[in-house]
Amino acid sequence: MKEYEIVCTYLNGCAGAAHPIRTFEEAELSSPDDYIREKHSADFSRFTKEIQSDGKIVYTFSETVTYIYEFTEI
């Protein structure tokens, strides 16, 4: 298991929200995939996954609402 800092950004296009909502947490995970699958089981297959050059893992779901999860190993 690895420890991650997780930043979740939520944008609601329908409600006309002008500002994103961000949450921060630290968690010990066996896999960031499992974390996303647990939170969004119905939509997991529609998330895109990107591994950035600095090792950060970013999952994005963008439809009426947008979720962006950033996992940084600590």
Q: Where in the sequence are the language-model features?
A:
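Short, non-transmembrane alpha-helical segments in secretory-pathway proteins
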Residues: 31-36
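Short, solvent-exposed coil/turn segments at beta-strand boundaries
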Residues: 1, 26-30, 52-54, 73-74
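Short, mixed-charge low-complexity intrinsically disordered segments
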Residues: 38-74
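A short, exposed loop/beta-hairpin motif centered on an aromatic-Gly-Thr core
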Residues: 15-29
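N-terminal targeting/docking segments
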Residues: 6-9, 22, 49, 66
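Short aromatic-glycine-(Arg/Gly/Cys) micro-motifs in beta-strand/loop hairpins
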Residues: 1-19
